[in-house]
Amino acid sequence: ASLFDGRGAGIDKDGNAEVESLRVRSYMQVMELIINRMRAMDGDLALTEGDNIESVEEVTDAEGHVSYKLHLKQQWEGYYTAQAVGNVLKGVINTLAQGSGTYYTSWMLLKDVDTATNTITVDLYPDDETPAGKNFPPCDMMNIIRWGNNIDPKMQSCIYLSSTEGVIKKLIHVTKPILDEGNDGFIIGNLPEWLTKDPSVPVDEGDDAVYVKTLLY
């Protein structure tokens, strides 16, 4: 039996019981009470360095080049960001629930880190170097994550779980916002178009599958 998907009732030979519900009219005595909670996730979850932008300062140099100085939120006392120079940053803002109607993605290249003030300086990627063909500046309350890095190979991978895409994926060799087939390390769930369109792959679009770049056995 399973705590989450079992049915009916049962007691095994060791005296472990599972039931759908239990009513006790007088009292219940137990040695230890363990409460299991189920945690739900909506949207996307990335296993990588992440921060929240507290405020944004636009900086223009003598040549007219615009950068953005991001003041990051302190997550606890003494916190400083783990972001590093060369990081490809993906930022998402969604305030639709608050009624402001703001929802967009920002792609940035990290140019400087100041851990003393917990600030970073970033440049925006050009529109034609982003997946949607349109980029947006960072803003207050935006969540940012390291997508990859254009300098350090050790920082060019991350794992993300997406309830919107229906996939668990490890990205590898990520040096820019736009991904290609060489950036997929493993995939569980919905396969990308480059795999579903391959006539040698026996799956249709929308089928659940497992893809691994290298399998050792």
Residue ranges of model-derived segments:
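Short, hydrophobic/proline-enriched secondary-structure or compact coil segments at domain edges
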Residues: A1, K69-Q75, V85-V92, T119-V122, ...
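Ser/Thr/Gly-rich low-complexity blocks that favor extended beta-strand/coil architectures
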Residues: K73-D152
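Low-complexity, small-hydrophobic/phenylalanine-enriched stretches
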Residues: A1-I35, G166-I168, I172-H173, P177-D180, ...
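Short, ordered beta-strand-loop transition motifs
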Residues: I11-D14, S55-K69, D112-T119, S162-T164, ...
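Amphipathic, membrane-inserting segments
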Residues: L47-K90
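Extended, well-structured beta-strand/loop surface patches
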Residues: N16, I144-G166, L191
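Glycine-rich, low-complexity segments
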Residues: A1, V19, V24-A62
